[in-house]
Amino acid sequence: SITTNKIYFGADTLPAQHNGSVSVTGLYAKKDFRIGGLHLNHRVLLQFSSAQEVVPVPLASVYLSYFYEFNVVKGVLRLQIGLDGRYNTKYAGFGYNPAIGQFYNRREYDEDGKLLEVGGYPFIDLFAAAKWKRMRIFVKMQHLNDDLIGGRNYFSVAHYPLTKRFLKVGFPW
């Protein structure tokens, strides 16, 4: 998409207007494989912003879901067990100002003058889901890889870490 004279919140968290056009170009690919009860679902988004300081986007975002699905009791109880994974390449990302309740285009640098970035960290969930007649139940260990890969450098927004590992149980029907 192409926008002109885009209004955004700058690094100082004040409204700013970009003079000129900003283009965000993306390419989305989806490919699912099924081999018997094994499901391999893939989603990839490649994107480019002509003005990262105005519209920061990661170069690539990937979502993978690998699970095995089978009948425990045919026609009555069906079960899925698998992993979900999400990954974004590193990019400048956004900051959040709670005083104004607004995300802003953050530009922060470390002591060496290197731009502080978010992303570059895989987020993996382990899940089991069952369908019994009309009722569904799921158990999910979100952020399974917490503290296992890359220390604790997992942020989606600057200074706001992603959730730690936790167990989630649900009964939708």
Language-model segments: residues:
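Exposed, low-structure sequence patches enriched in small/polar residues
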Residues: 1-173
